[in-house]
Amino acid sequence: MKTIIKTNYFSRVFLYGLIFSLCIFPLSAKARQTSSKKDLCIVIDPGHGGIQSGTQRGTVEEKTLNLKIAQYLKEALEKYKGVTVSLTRDGDYDVSLTDRTQYSVDKNADLMVSIHNNATGDCAAYDSGCTVLAAKDGYKQELADEEQKLACNILNELSALGIENQGILLRDSEANEKYENGELADYYAIIRGGVLKDIPTVLVEHAFVDDDSDFENYLSSDAKLKVLAEADAKGIARYYQLTTEDGKKAESPLENYKEKIVHIVDGNSKHNKISYKTYYPSSKKETEENSSNTDTATTKAEKQEQTTEKSAPEAKTDVGLESESQEKSSEESSNTSENTSSKSVTKP
């Protein structure tokens, strides 16, 4: 009898200790979603809003396009079982970059998807097509792998619509801001915030507002914006292996898949590092190959002319919204635009 009592006592001690440890030590983002919550919680972030119009084309403002895509994406994702979807904004008003990430924290989000559209600029050598921003390799590598693999699935679905796939974009801090391990932090605040808060976060640039072909084919009507959103949803569903309410399971996620990586180091496209990374199942390690120190992408004009030796007009991922300096200034003054390269803000 004494032996039985002692065994029960130690069993209770072990059980209490296990429960305590699970409460104290946080799980990874994906483990947290599958182990302690029923639903996959996704926060969709429509870029810009309020006085922050983003890029413009005549009377068309990026902030409006972003919100419509986000609303359609929410609608598409809610067709899947076990998914809860929220928006950081549901109208035309400004939300600070810090508040966007904090909203995801408050929602205990498993994923944050920031919705944007692009404009020609000077940090990447292309002026049309889609790209997805994600965390850099190195610091919190597991999180970076998760974001980049999700990005592959989203890009695959967008390119299936005919949009040119410009790959995954990574960018170094230009203010020498560093993570705890001493590595340069991510440049874009929405990506950096996700890293610091352990929330997988990607930013999708769907198409170029100032490119005639991109705009006409993908952004010129609500119906076309809905198609973009449904492609985003399909990519997310593939990665997380979601099932619709009527029992239809998403296609298997991409595996052994090679994707282009554009790594911006200083905002000058001539210094960009281009590589191709193969993404394997989780049991294998990702590999990078064919690295170069020059962004060799060309614009459509260059492809047509083939006679000029000048550098290509380069594209700025509109997400100047997400830069570290702009994040600070947007919080200091509500009159400061999140995207300093965009055209003058006009009322809708």
Map each language-model feature to its residues.
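Active-site histidine-acidic residue metal-binding/catalytic motifs
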Residues: 31-103, 107-109, 122, 126-129, ...
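Active-site-adjacent mobile loop/cap segments within catalytic or ligand-binding domains
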Residues: 43, 114-122, 171-281
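Stable alpha-helical elements in mature extracytoplasmic
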Residues: 62-65, 69, 73, 97-100, ...
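Solvent-exposed loop/turn segments at secondary-structure junctions
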Residues: 48-51, 90-95, 117-123, 137-141, ...
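Sec-exported extracytoplasmic/periplasmic mature domains
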Residues: 71-82, 105-109, 117, 146, ...
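Sec-dependent N-terminal signal peptides of Gram-positive bacterial secreted proteins and lipoproteins
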Residues: 7-30
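Active-site-adjacent substrate-binding region
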Residues: 147-186
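Ser/Thr/Gly/Pro-rich low-complexity, disordered linker/stalk segments of secreted
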Residues: 255-348
